[in-house]
Amino acid sequence: MAIHLYKTSTPSTRNGAVDSQVKSNPRNNLIHGQHHCGKGRNARGIITAGHRGGGHKRLYRKIDFRRNEKDTSGRIVTIEYDPNRNAYICLIHYGDGEKRYILHPRGAIIGDTIVSGTEVPISMGNALPLTDMPLGTAIHNIEITLGKGGQLARAAGAVAKLIAKEGKSATLRLPSGEVRLISKNCSATVGQVGNVGVNQKSLGRAGSKCWLGKRPVVRGVVMNPVDHPHGGGEGRAPIGRKKPTTPWGYPALGRRSRKRNKYSDSLILRRRK
């Protein structure tokens, strides 16, 4: 990832650091429009996810998370920007004429060849079942349910590690630090997701943040009591509670939000950090 630092000419470019290498040129048969959702609101119009709204219109790129083009090699033709995720995507031309988008593996360049199947080489970008991978393999785009497509380790720079195989299950260490069991028949892609330096980017101004659909973040302590439990008081007053809370009065900062008695509790050997 090439980070471009602006030459300071205006206040908005003083602290900007953006990626100037990857562009977007989507294929018409691999994109479709998407409805602009309710800006963080639910069906009743109540805010359930804060600081969302506005943003530029986006076209959704159809990503091949299943990698079910078995035993057919494909060639990386382009590496493109995707506005719907922080990872890059690359266009694959398969030998049978099929064209698909996949997540860009770290280190992959235009012209590289990838393949998916049961007996394929353990090389970057190849997709195969966990049972055919050696221990210690770095993987991403991991299936939870067989045939459903990859659901884990899909963000930019994400990578998981295969640490054990026993019986019908494989043990993985996920990017969050969680250690859990997954069926050995599930597939994954070898390597790490690209765009590792995404956290080095600095938009430099509020307007660029708004283009991404992210609204300003306001502290609860400066609100009125009707808007937040921390609000109110004369001047710079404390929050008036023993512990911080969310805008809806639930404990914040450390409260576990995972639902109890989920079916996957028995599959998690060590919870996330």
Curated annotation (Swiss-Prot):
Top-level taxon of the source organism: Eukaryota
Primary location recorded for the protein, binned into one broad class:
plastid
Q: Which Gene3D superfamilies match?
A: 2.30.30.30, Nucleic acid-binding proteins, Ribosomal protein L2, domain 3
Residues covered by region (Disordered) = 1-27, 224-273
Plastid in keyword set? yes
Indicate where this protein resides in the cell: Plastid, Chloroplast
The record's InterPro entries line, in alphabetical order, gives:
NA-bd_OB-fold, Rib_uL2_dom2, Ribosomal_uL2, Ribosomal_uL2_bac/org-type, Ribosomal_uL2_C, Ribosomal_uL2_CS, Ribosomal_uL2_dom3, Ribosomal_uL2_RNA-bd_dom
Per UniProt, the keywords (alphabetical) are: Chloroplast, Plastid, Ribonucleoprotein, Ribosomal protein
Protein's UniProt keywords contain Metal-binding: no
State whether it acts alone or in a complex, and with which partners, per the record: Part of the 50S ribosomal subunit.
- The family this protein is said to belong to: Belongs to the universal ribosomal protein uL2 family.
Q: What NCBIfam families does its record include?
A: rplB_bact (TIGR01171)
Q: What is this protein called?
A: Large ribosomal subunit protein uL2cy
The source organism is Liriodendron tulipifera
Q: Which gene encodes it?
A: rpl2-B
